[in-house]
């Protein structure tokens, strides 16, 4: 937790600013018009200038042209869809695969209700939520790595 600056209410300059209605923060400077008219547009234009500059100086290459007669043997999704792809690939029933995919966010929504503790406490004082997180991370990594392997080695990751 950072150290916050406490205002000196005996300061006559601060008291004068508070009397004018300018005391919504410690320094007495209002967000309007200073921040909203001068600082924010400079930051926004600077961000746009950086993006345009990078796009002009280093344009992204368009890849090789598509060839519909030379498709790969197995098409893989993007890396962040590997665990879901592995679930759909290994479960024999489509309905069961969809139910398993729906159960992941449903299970994540129930984690805060598993323990009735303050949310800012140490994770080691919340063993159930920490265990659910660690098991979920291991399972997601296992499914993600397995999705890159052939179907016969995907569940065991080729170890057995």
Curated annotation (Swiss-Prot):
GO molecular function: electron transporter, transferring electrons within cytochrome b6/f complex of photosystem II activity; electron transporter, transferring electrons within the cyclic electron transport pathway of photosynthesis activity; oxidoreductase activity
Predominant location category: plastid
SS bond list: none
A Gene Ontology biological process term: photosynthetic electron transport chain
InterPro entries with a match to the protein in the record: Cyt_b/b6_C (IPR005798), Cyt_b/b6_C_sf (IPR036150), Cyt_b6/f_cplx_suIV (IPR005870), Cytochrome_b_C_euk/bac (IPR048260)
GO terms under cellular component: chloroplast thylakoid membrane
Ranges annotated as spanning the membrane: 36-56, 95-115, 131-151
Localization (cell): Plastid, Chloroplast thylakoid membrane
NCBIfam families for the chain: cytb6_f_IV
Quaternary structure and partners: The 4 large subunits of the cytochrome b6-f complex are cytochrome b6, subunit IV (17 kDa polypeptide, petD), cytochrome f and the Rieske protein, while the 4 small subunits are petG, petL, petM and petN. The complex functions as a dimer.
Family classification: Belongs to the cytochrome b family. PetD subfamily.
Function statement: Component of the cytochrome b6-f complex, which mediates electron transfer between photosystem II (PSII) and photosystem I (PSI), cyclic electron flow around PSI, and state transitions.
Protein name: Cytochrome b6-f complex subunit 4
Species the sequence originates in: Hordeum vulgare
Lineage summary: Eukaryota, Viridiplantae, Streptophyta, Embryophyta, Tracheophyta
Underlying gene: petD
């Amino acid at each position: 937790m950072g150290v916050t600056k406490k205002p000196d209410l005996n300061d006559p300059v601060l008291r004068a600013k508070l009397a004018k209605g300018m005391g919504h923060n410690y320094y007495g400077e209002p967000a309007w018009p200073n921040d909203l008219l001068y600082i924010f547009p400079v930051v926004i234009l600077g961000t746009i200038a950086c993006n345009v500059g990078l796009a002009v100086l280093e344009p992204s290459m368009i890849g090789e042209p598509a060839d519909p007669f030379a498709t790969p043997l197995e098409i893989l999704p993007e890396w962040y869809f590997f665990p879901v792809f592995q679930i759909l690939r290994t479960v024999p029933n489509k309905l069961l695969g969809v139910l398993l995919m729906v159960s992941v966010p449903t299970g994540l929504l129930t984690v805060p209700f598993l323990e009735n503790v303050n949310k800012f406490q140490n994770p080691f004082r919340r063993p159930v939520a920490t265990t659910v997180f660690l098991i979920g991370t291991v399972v997601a990594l296992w499914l993600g790595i397995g999705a890159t392997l052939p179907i016969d080695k995907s569940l065991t990751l080729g170890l057995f």
